[in-house]
Amino acid sequence: APYVGMSLYTWTAIIAVVLAGLSVGHWIGGILAPPHVKVRTGLTRAGWALAASAVSTLAILILLRFVASLLMPSSLNPISVIVILSTALFFLPSFFVGIVSPILTKLAVDEDKGRHPGKIIGRMYALGTLGSIAGTLLAGFIFISWIGSVGTVLLVSAVYSALAISFFLIGSVRSTTSYLVLLFLMLSGTSMLGAKLQAFTSPCHIESDYFCIRIDEAPSFAPTARLMALDHLVHSINDSVEPSLFYSPYIHFVDEYTKQRMGNDPPSTYFIGGGGFSLPRAWVHEYKGTANLIAVEIDPAVTKAAI
């Protein structure tokens, strides 16, 4: 959101890239699950796929800063930037996690001794879909609100790591220790690089259910100017000392037009959307509380940040 915003193009690109990664992963997973594959071999391969998923998911936070810094100043159109950024971030994690399902499905069919392959395959499809639904609902309604998008990515990486470890423990008796050490080194190296680049710090000052909110100084306007950015766009610019000083021409126009129409009478106004509350704040100051002003903002975090 802080880089390309949240739009139909953003979600379309992300969904398409994730589905593409899963599709290629399913194909490769089928190749890694031939008829002669043994249970321990299959579980070990699934474990490595999950380990790669954990590392590539953790790397999302690093790649986001790096790739975005290259794409944003470029002359590419916004849709191209969104597609390239989505591919760089989400293809590999989706690809690696897509490998797991065909392998486990093959092992489940073998364990059933081929008596009900259709039932087993249908069950695996159903469980995979239910897992996708559960992950979507938990991320959208709980985890992003609770621990933010960065915390959610770290949590997903931790879950993949835990699953990889469990598959290593079950599938690889002799090589378990070396596998675990290698996984630890991969995760540690990625984590150290991310910490050095401050990739695990959220770019948002406040991450609400609706927006990535940032409050920054705007010295190019005035030493006392402050701006509010919602996602990737500057929403409002206010002066922390003089409420009646407008930096946005359209707000200045509304203020002057209202005074010409209303004269010296205090306005009675209903604001749909508060944002930085530039005009309500100015009119409260100018009319000394005599104006009848109602401002409605859907996001309480935006209101709190503005105040």
Name each region found by the language model.
Residues 239-254:
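Conserved SAM-binding loop and adjacent beta-strand
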Residues 1-207, 214-225, 230-237, 255, ...:
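Alpha-helical transmembrane segments of multi-pass membrane proteins
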Residues 18, 241-245, 270:
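Charge-dense, low-complexity intrinsically disordered segments
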